[in-house]
C-alpha cells in the first residue's frame, strides 16, 4: 500500500482518488478552496464537479499543502494546466528528494511553450516527475467504466511504479518513455476538439468530424515529430485515442465549448456556460506559437485561433479550410 496525495480536487483528481482508494492505497486530497474541502468532508462527493460519485470514507481532505506533501509518498498533480506553475511553487519547499509527482493535466504553458512536466521539473528539480494521460473522462472513471491510459516517465522504473499504483480490472495502464509525445498529443488534441465542437454547433455531419479528427492528428503528428516525439505515440492511446474521445464525447468540455461557439456564442460566453476550465483555449495560442517556432503549418489550429481571438465566424473558418490549395494527402507518397 502507498500513501498518495492528490493536489487538486477537480473532477479528474476526484475520480483518480477513487481508483487509488479502490486499490487499497491511503489517499488524501488537497485543494486551495476551503469551501470545496468542507463540502468533500461533509458529503464525500464532489457535487459540483463529479456528482453521483461517492468516495470511500477512507479518503481524507485538507487545505494544508505542506501536510499533504510531507505525509504522502507519491503526489498526483491534478490542477488545471493554467495553475500548474503557481501550484508547483507552493509545493516546492516541501517536496522530498526523488519524490514522485504524477502530472495528469494536459496543456502547454503559453508564455514559455513548456509542457506540464517541464514546468514542474523547472520549479521542483528534486522531484521524479511522471505523466499519465489517455482517453479518460473523469465521469466514466468515476463510474468504474473500463478505461485505458499510459504512464510516462524518464525511467522505466518510475513509469512502472505509476502503472502498479493505478492499474486494476477497470483501469488499465500502459507505460511509455515518450513523455514529450504523450504531453503534446494530450494538449494539442484539445484545440482540435474545439474545432470538432464548432462543426457540431454549425450542424455539420459525421463526414466533417471524421475529416477534422484525421487531419487534426496529422497536424499534431507533424509538429510533435519535428519536436522529437515518436510517431507510435501519436497513433496510440495518448494521441489518436485521446483525440477521438475528446472530439466525440458528451463529457468533453472542449467539444462543448466549441459547439457553443459554432452556435454563435462568444468565447467568453461559451467558457462561462461550460463552467469548468477549457484547456484548449489556453493551449491554442501556444500551439500556434510552437508551429511558428518549428516552421510547421497547422491550418486547423490556425483557424481555431482566428475564431477564438479574432472573432472570425466558425462557418467562414471551415470554408477556408475546405478551399485551401489543392495538395496530395501525404507528402511522403508519390506516383511511380
UniProtKB/Swiss-Prot annotation:
Coiled coil located at which positions?
Answer: none
**One GO molecular-function entry:** glycerol-3-phosphate dehydrogenase [NAD(P)+] activity
Work out whether the entry's keyword set contains Lipid metabolism.
yes
**One GO cellular component term noted in the UniProt record for this chain:** cytosol
Q: Where is the active site?
A: 189
Superkingdom of this protein's organism: Bacteria
Q: What is its EC number?
A: 1.1.1.94
What sections of the protein cross the membrane?
none
| Compartments (UniProt record) | Cytoplasm
SUPFAM superfamilies found in the cross-reference section: 6-phosphogluconate dehydrogenase C-terminal domain-like, NAD(P)-binding Rossmann-fold domains
Any idea which positions bind NADPH?
11-12, 106, 138, 253, 277, 279
Pathway membership: Membrane lipid metabolism; glycerophospholipid metabolism
Instruction: List ligand-binding residues for sn-glycerol 3-phosphate.
Output: 106, 134, 136, 189, 242, 252-254
Identify which top EC class this enzyme belongs to.
Answer: oxidoreductase
Enumerate the Gene3D superfamilies for this protein: N-(1-d-carboxylethyl)-l-norvaline Dehydrogenase, domain 2, NAD(P)-binding Rossmann-like Domain
Reactions mediated catalytically: sn-glycerol 3-phosphate + NAD(+) = dihydroxyacetone phosphate + NADH + H(+); sn-glycerol 3-phosphate + NADP(+) = dihydroxyacetone phosphate + NADPH + H(+)
Q: Give a single Pfam family match.
A: NAD_Gly3P_dh_C
Which Gene Ontology BP annotations are present? carbohydrate metabolic process; glycerol-3-phosphate biosynthetic process; glycerol-3-phosphate catabolic process; glycerophospholipid metabolic process; phospholipid biosynthetic process
Q: Which family does it belong to?
A: Belongs to the NAD-dependent glycerol-3-phosphate dehydrogenase family.
The protein's job, in short, is: Catalyzes the reduction of the glycolytic intermediate dihydroxyacetone phosphate (DHAP) to sn-glycerol 3-phosphate (G3P), the key precursor for phospholipid synthesis.
Return the protein name: Glycerol-3-phosphate dehydrogenase [NAD(P)+]
Say which species the protein is native to: Agathobacter rectalis (strain ATCC 33656 / DSM 3377 / JCM 17463 / KCTC 5835 / VPI 0990)
Output the lineage of the source organism: Bacteria, Bacillati, Bacillota, Clostridia, Lachnospirales
Amino acid at each position: 500500500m502507498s500513501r498518495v496525495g492528490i493536489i487538486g480536487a477537480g473532477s479528474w483528481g476526484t475520480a483518480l482518488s477513487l481508483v487509488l482508494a479502490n486499490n487499497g492505497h491511503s489517499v488524501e486530497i488537497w485543494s486551495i478552496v476551503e469551501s470545496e474541502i468542507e463540502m468533500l468532508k461533509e458529503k464525500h462527493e464532489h457535487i459540483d464537479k463529479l456528482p453521483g460519485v461517492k468516495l470511500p470514507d477512507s479518503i481524507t481532505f485538507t487545505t494544508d499543502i505542506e501536510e499533504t506533501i510531507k505525509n504522502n509518498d507519491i503526489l498526483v498533480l491534478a490542477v488545471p494546466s493554467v495553475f500548474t506553475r503557481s501550484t508547483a511553487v507552493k509545493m516546492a519547499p516541501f517536496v522530498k528528494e526523488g519524490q514522485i509527482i504524477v502530472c495528469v493535466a494536459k496543456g502547454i504553458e503559453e508564455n514559455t511553450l513548456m509542457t506540464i512536466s517541464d514546468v514542474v521539473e523547472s520549479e521542483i528539480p528534486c522531484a521524479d516527475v511522471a505523466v499519465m494521460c489517455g482517453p479518460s473522462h473523469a465521469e466514466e472513471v468515476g463510474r468504474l467504466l473500463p478505461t485505458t491510459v499510459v504512464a510516462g516517465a524518464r525511467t522505466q522504473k518510475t513509469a512502472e511504479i505509476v502503472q502498479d499504483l493505478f492499474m486494476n480490472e477497470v483501469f488499465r495502464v500502459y507505460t511509455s518513455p515518450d513523455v514529450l509525445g504523450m504531453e503534446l498529443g494530450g494538449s494539442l488534441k484539445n484545440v482540435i476538439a474545439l474545432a470538432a465542437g464548432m462543426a457540431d454547433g454549425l450542424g455539420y455531419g459525421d463526414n466533417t468530424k471524421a475529416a477534422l479528427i484525421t487531419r487534426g492528428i496529422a497536424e499534431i503528428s507533424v509538429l510533435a515529430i519535428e519536436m522529437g516525439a515518436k510517431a507510435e505515440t501519436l497513433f496510440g492511446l495518448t494521441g489518436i485515442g485521446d483525440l477521438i474521445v475528446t472530439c466525440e464525447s458528451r463529457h468533453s468540455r472542449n467539444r462543448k465549448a466549441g459547439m457553443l461557439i459554432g452556435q454563435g456564442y462568444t468565447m467568453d460566453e461559451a467558457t462561462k456556460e461550460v463552467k469548468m476550465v477549457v484547456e484548449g483555449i489556453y493551449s491554442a495560442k501556444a500551439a500556434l506559437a510552437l508551429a511558428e517556432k518549428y516552421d510547421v503549418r497547422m491550418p486547423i489550429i490556425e483557424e481555431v485561433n482566428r475564431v477564438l481571438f479574432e472573432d472570425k465566424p466558425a462557418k467562414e473558418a471551415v470554408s477556408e479550410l475546405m478551399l485551401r490549395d489543392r495538395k496530395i494527402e501525404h507528402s511522403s507518397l508519390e506516383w511511380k
